[in-house]
Amino acid sequence: MKSELIFLPVPAFGHLVGMVEMAKLFISRHENLSVTVLISKFFIDTGIDNYNKSLLAKPTPRLTIINLPEIDPQKYLLKPRCAIFPSLIENQKTHVRDVMSRMTQSESTRIVGLLADILFVDIFDIADEFNVPTYVYSPAGTGFLGLAFHLQTLNDDKKQDVTEFRNSDTELLVPSFANPVPAEFSPSIFLEKDGRHDVLLSLYRRCREAKGIIVNTFEELEPYAINSLRMDSMIPPIYPVGPILNLNGEGQNSDEAAVILGWLDDQPPSSVVFLCFGSFGSFPENQVKEIAMGLERSGHRFLWSLRPCISEGETTLQLKYSNLELPAGFLDRTSCVRKVIGWAPQMAVLAHEAVGGFVSHCGWNSVLESVWYGMPVATWPMYGEQQLNAFEMVKELGLAVEIEVDYRNEYNKSDFIVKADEIETKIKKLMMDGKNSKIRKKVKEMKEKSRVAMSENGSSYTSLAKLFEEIM
């Protein structure tokens, strides 16, 4: 009888890719294991369709992809942003139940576990109906995971209203961080007084029911955070199995990628600063102009992934930028040293020898990718847990320089503008070998550690072996 794991990823590109690549890793490491991935359609992230098609075009043995029936987007897009994915999975419960029912009726299959993205943990209700063990996948780092559990504990056990931390100078003593953490670096949703924080807190309560939490990180990157969570008897066992990355670039637009990489081929080694802010990383026009002026004044070559703003309620991400957002004459004046694009093949760009620095929103996947390729980072977090990731990269790990950690851009409502002078200064600091050699050295060392972690007998390799012992 074959052993089957069911994976339920959130249909946002970074979340989905991480879980599918993890499924491939599991299969490669255990010959008696198969994985079925259940994918929901999500109207905002168009990159998912391309990635999905690439998976179906190149099937992997023992990996089954099932596309769940589409849900009317009005049933979840009208919810507050933090509730979109929990609402989506609530509407998919019937379909997940049908899949699990068919699988349990098969005499040749034994479901050994259901692994759900942390935003989909309410699906545990369905797993419980079939007495299937449940596991959580955290696409964010262990530091953030520790903060989330800490806030949930403060709220539930200490009766602390965590929304009072909003706009406060409070510093939190979070077990997963060696340094005091400014409370304002918590994801804004945790601090909202309109009840939205309850949605997030409920997810982390539910996480505690799981038999284990699988995290896309590795021991050498977050030793303090990982050890702190393992010492907490109220938190399920932690399994760091990363870095898990989309190294083959499935789902990318090969024609656009070829043009971008061709331009990089013509640039000197380590001469280009790459700016990319994730799927939802867009700026209002006044901030775009400040970035443009800062880049021009820095004198460095640059590759800038610039996306137009997305408004609340929009159902599709826009991948192209408008020249109208840029300062007059900017493209002409910088034509010899720049390339401004919409979508970017981020992994391939970071791997290119022409790139010498990365200005990033500090989404956790981007953090892992920068470490894997030994790329120094200048942090510019925008939303979600990114402020905390930036704090961890700069203050805890010493792997990045800071452009701005206080910037927040929720649907482009930020009134705070980072000025061109500061952008110019920080880009020069990022790209200058002299003043920044310590960070470059640490990043290169962590690059080697990340690869050792995934190799035989490495920390993540061993952690996955322990997980298999638990599951099988």
UniProtKB/Swiss-Prot annotation:
Positions annotated to bind UDP-alpha-D-glucose: A344, Q346, H361, W364, N365, S366, E369, E385, Q386
Database matches in InterPro entries: UDP-glycosyltransf_plant, UDP_glucos_trans, UDP_glycos_trans_CS
Pathway per the UniProt entry: Secondary metabolite biosynthesis; terpenoid biosynthesis
Binding site for an anthocyanidin: H15, G384
The enzyme's E.C. designation: 2.4.1.366
Keywords noted in UniProt: Glycosyltransferase, Isoprene biosynthesis, Transferase
Active-site residues, record numbering mapped to chain: H15, D117
Taxonomic superkingdom: Eukaryota
Pfam families (alphabetical): UDPGT (PF00201)
Biological processes annotated in GO: terpenoid biosynthetic process
Reaction(s) the record says it catalyses: (20S)-ginsenoside F1 + UDP-alpha-D-glucose = (20S)-ginsenoside Rg1 + UDP + H(+)
GO molecular function, one term: UDP-glucosyltransferase activity
The family this protein is said to belong to: Belongs to the UDP-glycosyltransferase family.
Function statement: Probable component of the triterpene saponins (e.g. ginsenosides) biosynthetic pathway. No detectable activity toward protopanaxatriol (PPT).
Stated name of the protein: UDP-glucosyltransferase 103
Organism: Panax ginseng
Lineage of origin: Eukaryota, Viridiplantae, Streptophyta, Embryophyta, Tracheophyta
